[in-house]
């Protein structure tokens, strides 16, 4: 059973490769995203399926550390990351599409889903009644993530 599904998107005045570099620089997420207070890379090598890291953030009412893992990666167009939080699985898909007359910009779309199939019937009922309170807050966090990704991609574009 899916809980919330949140779609957010923006257009960034930087090419997909630069935006991809920001999204996949998970070791520095705490320096880029205001919703992340700490990030620690747990695997070695380049960003790809299996890359794992731990970060501290607030999402869907959960405050604290969570371990994330890349489950899909199609550089520089699409990636999906997943985290288990309690009995839930939170999955975020990033889709990067070239935009603008010369494809110098990027349309970045994020879809975040919380999968609650492992919750008890009572827990799912409680979510149905009270889960909406976290929806608006989480949507705002994701919109801030988009703003922060845009700011960092633009900053990197102007840094020699």
Predicted feature residues:
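Generic C-terminal helix-cap and adjacent flexible tail
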Residues: 2, 16-17, 151-160
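Beta-strand elements of well-folded, non-transmembrane domains
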Residues: 12-14, 61, 114-118
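A short, structured loop/turn motif at beta-sheet edges
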Residues: 16-17, 44-47, 71-76, 95-107, ...
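Beta-strand/loop substructures that line and gate deep hydrophobic ligand-binding cavities in soluble
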Residues: 84-144, 149-151, 160
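Hydrophobic pocket/interface hotspot
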Residues: 19-23, 29, 53, 70, ...
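Short, surface-exposed coil-to-beta transition loops
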Residues: 5-7, 63-67, 88-93
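Short beta-strand segments that buttress and anchor functional surface loops
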Residues: 51-58, 79-85
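Hydrophobic ligand-binding cavity/cleft-lining segments
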Residues: 1-44, 48
């Amino acid at each position: 059973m899916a809980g919330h599904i949140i779609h957010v998107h923006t257009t960034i005045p930087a090419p997909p490769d630069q935006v991809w570099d920001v999204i996949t620089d998970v070791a520095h997420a705490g320096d880029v995203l205001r919703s992340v207070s700490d990030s620690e890379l747990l695997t070695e090598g380049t960003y790809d399926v299996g890359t794992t890291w731990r970060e501290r953030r607030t999402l869907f009412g959960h405050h604290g550390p969570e371990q994330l893992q890349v489950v899909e990666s199609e550089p520089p167009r699409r990636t999906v990351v997943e985290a288990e939080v309690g009995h839930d699985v939170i999955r975020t898909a990033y889709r990067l599409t070239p935009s603008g007359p010369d494809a110098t910009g990027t349309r970045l779309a994020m879809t975040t889903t919380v999968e609650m199939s492992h919750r008890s019937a009572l827990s799912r009922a409680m979510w149905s009644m009270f889960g909406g309170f976290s929806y608006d807050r989480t949507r705002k966090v994701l919109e801030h993530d988009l703003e922060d990704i845009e700011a960092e991609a633009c900053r990197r574009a102007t840094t020699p």
